[in-house]
Amino acid sequence: MQAPIVIIGSGFAAYQLVKTVRRMDAHIPLQVFTADDGAEYNKPDLSHVFSNKQTARDLVVKSGEAFAQEHNIELFAHTKVEHVDVQAQQVLVNGQAYPYSKLVFATGAKAFVPPISGDAAPEMITLNSLQEYQLAEEQISRAKRILVMGGGLIGVEIAMDLATSGKAVTVVEPNPRLLANLIPEFVALPLENQLKQQGIQLALETGVAAINHSNDSLVASLSQGKAIEADVVISAAGLRANTWLAKACGLSVNKGIEVNARLQTSAANVFALGDCAEIQGRMMPYLQPIVLSANALGKQLLGQEAELKLPPMMVKVKTPSYPIQLAGDFSSVTNWSVQISQTGIAAKAEDENSRLMGFVVTGEQVTQAFPLLRELSQAGQA
């Protein structure tokens, strides 16, 4: 009897792959090992839980048992894979070996928590998963003042949602502007103004050096010398791929588990996708590349030839009162063609030959996003 396909992880990437495989083959044996309960949920909804007044339970689409039954998989919930033997093609769990025909790492990423001193530093919370939100939801619902460490995509989305739900929010960001790695300054400034209008305090070009207890509050001491009182401190300082298991079994790992266009790792019959994978040198923690990865990998697991081809992809910043959508590569931009109106911004990024390299649209101008995405795709094919 053929050994099953084994998937480590039960997040969006893992379950997208399961669905893809099952659309093509209803019976090939699939085993999923996960450290949590295996519940299916929509992770992007975590950006809106506070304003939507949702509990962790509200976000669950299906229990792990229901998902396993519907998709005919063997689910090992609350089960940590201790080791992978890539020569023998086995995973080791609780001292028992489980053989695989093909193995997929879908181990995701964890929220990065910067090293910070102070007696309250261990009380920092993260919101990168349903389980983390479940642990923190009562604490956050009681809190009036919340400090968000990090002004990137996750930090900005959470901050706006918390403010919309009535919390007093401060965002601390070491860069001189928000979303510094994602959008140009002329888009960041109106976003910052919108956040300020919603009552959000911004502490830019500084970081949190220490968090200590003070009476019933937490006090965050900033590197610039200022102190901010808060009831809760959330770390939204980016993600780090979960690679320890891959490293331990000898796979090639950089920021993520290194894979080629076929999602193959450095070991035979071992693959990776999702937030843990570094695809040809790129980390892509967004839904669309994961869906496309799952489609390509699903075919390969069933013996078909398939390569991942990534078109220009849209990134949506989920900030409802100032929506932003963007696509493309801004690294070689020499010129921005910008239209600014009262209803938003439409900006095209061009190289020295006036070729479209990317775009950013905001506010009501987001209606231009899909026509610009088509134009960007055509420019890439020219």
Where are these predicted regions, by residue range?
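Beta1-alpha1 glycine-rich phosphate/pyrophosphate-binding loop at the start
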Residues: Q2-I73, D161-L182
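Rossmann-like dinucleotide-binding cores of NAD(P)H-dependent redox enzymes
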Residues: V60, I154-A210, I290, L308-K316, ...
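Glycine-rich Rossmann-fold phosphate-binding loop(s) that bind the pyrophosphate
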Residues: G9-F12, N128, M149-G152
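FAD-binding beta-loop-beta segment adjacent to the flavin cofactor pocket
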Residues: A111, I257-V270, F330-A347
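Mid-to-C-terminal Rossmann-like scaffold of FAD/NAD(P)H-dependent oxidoreductases
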Residues: Q2-P4, S10, R23, C276-P371
